Structure formats: C-alpha cells, structure tokens
Amino acid sequence: MAEWIECKISDIGTVVGGATPSTKKPDNYENGTIAWITPKDLSTFSGRYIQHGERNITESGLRSCSTQLLPKNTVLFSSMAPIGYVAIAANDVCTNQGFKSVIPNENTNPLFLYYLLKYNKDKIEGMGSGTTFKEVSGNTMKNIVVSVPTDKKVQERISSMLGSIDDKIEENERINNNLATHPCNTRIATKQRRQIPRMDECLHTDGKVSDRGGNEETAEQFSSLLTA
C-alpha cells in the first residue's frame, strides 16, 4: 500500500507570486511575446494546460516589476478575485498579482499537484483574509497542509486516472459543441453527459478508471486522501 504523508505546500513546490507592469508605459506590452496570465483569463478557460492569456508583455515589462517567468508545468492558482482557478503552464509564463503559483519540485508530479489544489480549493479559500475581498497570501499558501503519496509513481497513476476522466469530458464537450440544435442531437448530448463518471465514481479496487464506478468505499477513500 502506498504511503501518504501530511506536508505543507512549500514541501512539494515553490510558491511564487506575480505582478502587473505599468499600463502607462506602452513598451511594457506592445509586441510582447511573454505570456502573462490573469484570473480573468482563467475565468473562461476550461482546459488544464494554458499557453497564454489575453495579453503578452515584453522583456522590459518583465524587468519593470516583480513578476517572474514561471517554467513549464508550474501550477497556476488564483489567490484573489476569485480564489481557486487552477491551470498548468504549457510553456514559460508569468502572472499578475492575482496568483500564488506553485513550481513543483522533482518529487511532485505537476498534474497530480493540479488536482490536489483543485480538490483543496475550498480549504484554501477558507484561509483567505481581507475586508473588500478575500485573498490568500504567499505565506498562507506555503503553510497549507495537504496529504500526498510519497511515491511519485502513485501520484502519476492518480493523475492519469483523473486525467482520463477530464479527457472524456473535453471530448464530449467538443462533440456537443459541433452538434446542431436538433431535438435528436440534444438527446445524444444528454446521454453523453450521463456517461461521464463523477469524480467519486472513478475507481475500482484494481485501480482502473471506470465508466460508471462501482466501488464506493475505494472512491470515498481516494477522495478523503486528496482532501485531507
């Protein structure tokens, strides 16, 4: 049986904030080639891997503020307005101040970290503070306790299972978006949605992804380990 341990987010990755180059200086943005992500970009983003946002910044824009260039596979987590948008950097990106992103260390699978943060969204949001709107500080993010398997291969198996479910969801969404508004096609789309397993239905005891589940105890165990 895989060993799970409780640890802080800072034990499994490096927490990094972001910033906004001055919009009063056109040179910070015009013809920029560096992807710069804001929470607004993630509000309309439904995938897992993000390449760029609505705007890019330039090298001078990057140097002008405290935003940092984050490497591919960094997990972006919005820490304000709102808390809880999650995506994985598909390439080098930087963000505004609305993120506390996590660069996974060598013992942490990036996709597992993505799902771990998604599962702990409510917990993290509950630790936010502020009067006008809630915000999660860098120090708070670093010290949030999560439960993770020590074996990276176990992390990879878990993320692969959950990734298979998301792959199916995304495939069905693409199909549904291409269907005409004929009543028959509406019924097809409804049937496809019913075939997508809920997260708590995804495991059998043999660890395989299930279309409909069938082992409630294993699923509950799995969910509780992720959200611990």
Place the predicted regions along the sequence by residue:
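A generic structural signal for well-ordered coil/turn residues at beta-strand boundaries
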Residues: E30-T33, S66, P82, A89, ...
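Short glycine/proline-centered loop/turn elements that form peptide/ligand docking sites
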Residues: I50-H52, C65, N172
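A short beta-sheet element
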Residues: G18, T38-K40, E54-K118, G128, ...
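Short clusters of hydrophobic/aromatic residues that line enzyme substrate/ligand-binding pockets
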Residues: Y29, I50, I57, V86, ...
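A short glycine-rich beta-alpha junction/loop motif
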Residues: A2, S79, V93-K100, G130-S159
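Structural signal for hydrophobic packing residues in well-ordered secondary-structure cores
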Residues: K121, E125-G128, I169, P183
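Non-catalytic DNA-recognition/assembly elements of restriction-modification systems
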Residues: M1-T20, N143, S147-S210, T218-A219
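DNA target-recognition patches
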Residues: E6-V16, T23-G61, R194-A228
